[in-house]
From Swiss-Prot:
Organism: Saccharomyces cerevisiae (strain ATCC 204508 / S288c)
InterPro entries tied to this protein: Dynamin, Dynamin_GTPase, Dynamin_GTPase_CS, Dynamin_N, Dynamin_stalk, G_DYNAMIN_dom, GED, GED_dom
Descriptive protein name: Vacuolar protein sorting-associated protein 1
GO biological process: actin cytoskeleton organization; actin filament bundle assembly; autophagosome assembly; autophagy; cell division; endocytosis; intracellular distribution of mitochondria; lipid tube assembly
SUPFAM superfamilies named among the record's database cross-references: P-loop containing nucleoside triphosphate hydrolases
Chain spans, region G1 motif: 36-43
Gene that this polypeptide is encoded by: VPS1
Biased composition (Basic and acidic residues): 98-122
Pfam families per UniProt: Dynamin_M, Dynamin_N, GED
PROSITE patterns: G_DYNAMIN_1, G_DYNAMIN_2, GED
Domain Dynamin-type G: 26-336
Entry-linked Gene3D superfamilies: Dynamin, middle domain, P-loop containing nucleotide triphosphate hydrolases
Amino acid sequence: MDEHLISTINKLQDALAPLGGGSQSPIDLPQITVVGSQSSGKSSVLENIVGRDFLPRGTGIVTRRPLVLQLINRRPKKSEHAKVNQTANELIDLNINDDDKKKDESGKHQNEGQSEDNKEEWGEFLHLPGKKFYNFDEIRKEIVKETDKVTGANSGISSVPINLRIYSPHVLTLTLVDLPGLTKVPVGDQPPDIERQIKDMLLKYISKPNAIILSVNAANTDLANSDGLKLAREVDPEGTRTIGVLTKVDLMDQGTDVIDILAGRVIPLRYGYIPVINRGQKDIEHKKTIREALENERKFFENHPSYSSKAHYCGTPYLAKKLNSILLHHIRQTLPEIKAKIEATLKKYQNELINLGPETMDSASSVVLSMITDFSNEYAGILDGEAKELSSQELSGGARISYVFHETFKNGVDSLDPFDQIKDSDIRTIMYNSSGSAPSLFVGTEAFEVLVKQQIRRFEEPSLRLVTLVFDELVRMLKQIISQPKYSRYPALREAISNQFIQFLKDATIPTNEFVVDIIKAEQTYINTAHPDLLKGSQAMVMVEEKLHPRQVAVDPKTGKPLPTQPSSSKAPVMEEKSGFFGGFFSTKNKKKLAALESPPPVLKATGQMTERETMETEVIKLLISSYFSIVKRTIADIIPKALMLKLIVKSKTDIQKVLLEKLYGKQDIEELTKENDITIQRRKECKKMVEILRNASQIVSSV
């Protein structure tokens, strides 16, 4: 069952490989990613785990593409002489016969003339299905060849992985992703920004939450300066998904060891550290086999005074077992999430494929008819609040128009104040002008109407502005509808629908504006002084009288009760010399010379201090203007939105389908309108590929 779990992830890796590998796959698979500097011994650790020399070697960047290494434990046939430890206590069977040992030392397993049944371990590449590599030197050459095929021979790098599966009775079932080694300085013809390129690639792999980071670090250098560990801590600062490997333990200075690191007293990691010993360059040149190196590693830890008591927690065999255990545990934890993610992603691409439409296109006429019908229905639905997808984040469609009506427009109307333009002197002047040559005995209706009509005209600007705002909102709905993928399929038709819709709105805006202006003119034309909500003139005069002459109630000093009011015995006001309409134009000096009459100035204004009567009349008119203006505000705030609903909004909802059919359906260029977008064609191919891959992935995980 445990091996089946890892095998399932291996199959998923292969299934998702066409998507560009682990860094670009939409599914975050649990995997162990191997990071470290070029000099950390990363490749040697992997070869020790496999028990074979198969990775490219050389100077500079050797690993230039991620290598997804899938190790499959293959039980040997009964006829084979090799004794394999099935309990996984040993990684490599050291009792292999002499003939096999000689083959290992030579590094050659010839494929020619030998049947598959005679071989116990081999490699297979995903890009070469069905071909088995028994010669591990050939595996190395194929890795180099496939790397150069994508990156070229100029030491460039690529994030597209190479998938290699190795079957052997001498390995534990395990999956590792070998990433390019970190480097500081470009060598040879490497790009000048090679350090940044490698770091960016590694971060794409190890940043994924389901990635276990295997950080390979040289023990004979300061751990705090380890490139691999520093990179791991960028994405995993707490060390919760990082395991450390300490190489070159045998090369440390005399009297030093890694006990403090192993105990977690330096840089603690959740999975801890495991010390190993690799072959040096001299060992490789002298053809020292990996089996011999593993035996030397075992003896080193068993005999070293610092490690002998913990030798069974050191070395490559323990590293392989621990990685196997970590990966299995990680897979068990993440598998439900992976299943859900695969199903959700599959559904997403299936829906997109449906929106993109099938490859076999219907007749041009039926396509145009279908698109116009869909557009008209969706437009009406958005206006009425019946859209398929209602947002919970922001207002849209008809709700935005309602906001424009009842918030934006109403606030604009309410903010109009007639007295920010009308001054008391203006009222005084109009009162005298409206009375003509004979002074008026009462507050003039003419002055009131003149002033009110002037102020009603001010409602025209915000009302016409409302037409523009509603126009913009309807265009916004248009853009919301045609932004859907199904409209992107036919860009010419989408553009035609958009243009015709906007032109329709522009045409409808003209009579709408005229209607709005007529409504304002109607309010100006007839001032309804009999309106039931209008303040009566007598009420206004009483209010002004109380304001100008507040009555003081006498109080009985003995009882504290108000005394009865005495009837007023006021006399007619005495007109002072300086009061009156013309008082401001003539000084006292001129009054004495009335015999010498002069012509009035060309521009004659009502100036000077107002009389008590003028003050009262002015205040009365102001009260009446304020009262009537409030009535007009309510009327305008109510009737103008209704006018727009009639002339623009409802008209567009009921007439747009008919207009679009008249303009677009059955025209000569209808074939051009239904020509598919190249982007749509390409996207459909991509979605079909994704659906196929994800269906395969879904079938793989459904068996677990």
